[in-house]
Amino acid sequence: MTTRLYLSPTPPRNDREGASKSTSASIKHDAYLPPADGNRVLVDRFGRIARDLRVSLTDRCNLRCTYCMPAEGLEWLPTEQTLNDAEVLRLLHIAVVKLGIRQIRFTGGEPLLRKNLEDIIAGTAALRTDEGEKVHIALTTNGLGLDKRIAGLKEAGLDRVNISLDTIDAERYVSLTRRDRLSGVLASIDAAVAAGLHPVKINAVVMPGVNEVDIVPLAEYCISKGAQLRFIEQMPLGPREQWKRGDMVTAEEILARLEEKFTLSPAKEPRGAAPAALWNAVDKSNPVITGQIGIIASVTHPFCGDCDRSRLTTDGTIRNCLFSRTETPLRDALRDGASDDELAQLWAGAMWEKKPGHGIDDEGFLQPDRPMSAIGG
């Protein structure tokens, strides 16, 4: 079936394997690896350049999703260990002006719990690339309270929002999140669409025996709202007993369920470094109803060869991969008086060490020590 063929791994951009051989010989680790025009970039030894920065603004969350954290929650970082607003904005300035970052996504925990979020977004929106352009600013949120703040966030400079929603069944939502807050999330989706933050993206993690039955209802709901639904294969980032490689719901299984209701065809727009394979969906029973659905097959069809992300945690460390077990701390160097150039050098060195892939299928794979709520999506 064509949908299965489309999910085969895409070849890395610019033939990464070949590029890594030629690039590694010419790029030196002891500089920030500037191209000829003098602009610096975050490049790794395989030639991938990071343009997309994920910034975790807090490790705190107001939900207790079963696949993310225990019912009692986790021990939050003390405030003095987390970056303050000025420190966040200084590192973002370095990222944009010195290191070539062009997209910034604020995550958590739950970023709406961060005090002064609007001020942080406004400060980020004031940054300009060396081409004089504003960086693209996005937010990943569980949606609780977003409806009341969406106008202020957009005015501050927010361009787009991703809202996490794994089910539209009220009872299942309570079971999954351990909170009765579904109506608030749905109100926030309506508010984000009304605010024109197009496309509003809805992220749904599919878990075996939990919410497989929600695949089609979620798709119908998101299409009716004009939002872009993205199904995500569950990854080994929560409680270790929650994930087994052989039990997970794969991208192909998700597509098979969708095909019971929709006619699917691959979207024509280039995928680039985006994690989702996009599908145009037409309702079989009513062809007037159309929309777009994304599938993020991080486990079965990883996109590591095209990854363009760097990650900054709320306590000021750089992670070059979501699944990395090593981190490069910037906070202490920043507080000890390091210059922007010195901080940029540390950052560049961290990204240079990025591995070719996440290694989930490797025999010796170990989950990262940090839970997903402390890394950021």
UniProtKB/Swiss-Prot annotation:
Chain residues that bind GTP = R54, R105, T140, K201, R309, S310, R311
**Any keyword 4Fe-4S?**
yes
Q: Which sites bind [4Fe-4S] cluster 1? A: C61, C65, C68
Biological or metabolic pathway of the protein: Cofactor biosynthesis; molybdopterin biosynthesis
Which positions does UniProt annotate for S-adenosyl-L-methionine binding?
Answer: Y67, G109, S164, M235
- Please give the superkingdom of this protein's source: Bacteria
One Gene Ontology BP term is: Mo-molybdopterin cofactor biosynthetic process
NCBIfam families for this protein = moaA
On subunit structure and binding partners, the annotation says: Monomer and homodimer.
Q: What's the name of the protein?
A: GTP 3',8-cyclase
In its UniProt entry, the species of origin is given as Corynebacterium glutamicum (strain R)
Its encoding gene is what?
A: moaA
